[in-house]
Amino acid sequence: MSQNITLIKDKILSDNYFTLRNITYDLTRRNGKVIRHKREVYDRGNGATILLYNSTKKTVVLVRQFRVATWVNGNEDGMLIETCAGLLDNDEPEVCIRKEAIEETGYDVGEVRKIFELYMSPGGVTELIHFFIAEYRDSERASTGGGVEDEDIEVLELPFSRALEMARSGEIRDGKTVLLLNYLHMSHLMG
């Protein structure tokens, strides 16, 4: 028997930036028993992320920026090293990630390859992230990057081996970045 869901109540608690909803629903379990649940769900839209790599130089491009949620949760300076990423904002995932790559890193990359799409925190966040990789070349640098007006993004070109070590040691603590670095390592695209 499949699980059946009956929506009882969907109340918007806040929609100042994204939407926080309180959802009440009945869930029919596999054994037929109906259980009522009440959960808060944060809807921030879907996103995309990309890891830029250079197989000749054996480097990757990451960014460092302030993330308030990490600061609230004990990251002393709130800075996070991560892959370039952004919300889709009604764009197709590849269109979004190309725009974000130029804005954040300055690279106008050629071919991009979609790897997978994942829910990163499905217990309470609706966001589905589309994961990409792309090889970059120095000649594809269209600008210095750094983000748009209200962003302060530092562009980091790192040896791939160093980035992997940073992920292993906990210096890189962003889930999407650790996933993409490990994907690149397992795929042997860096030789």
From Swiss-Prot:
GO CC annotation, single: cytosol
Highest taxon in the source lineage: Bacteria
Record-stated family: Belongs to the Nudix hydrolase family. NudK subfamily.
Gene Ontology MF term list: hydrolase activity, acting on acid anhydrides, in phosphorus-containing anhydrides; metal ion binding
Enzyme category, top tier: hydrolase
Gene3D superfamilies hit by this protein: Nucleoside Triphosphate Pyrophosphohydrolase
EC number(s) reported in the record: 3.6.1.-
Function: Nucleoside diphosphate sugar hydrolase that hydrolyzes GDP-mannose as its preferred substrate, yielding GMP and mannose-1-phosphate.
Residues in Nudix hydrolase domain copies: 43-180
The protein, known as: GDP-mannose pyrophosphatase
GO BP terms in the entry: nucleoside phosphate metabolic process; ribose phosphate metabolic process
Alphabetical keyword list: Hydrolase, Magnesium, Metal-binding
Any matching Pfam family: NUDIX
Residues that, per the record, bind Mg(2+) 1: 85, 104
Coiled coil feature spans: none
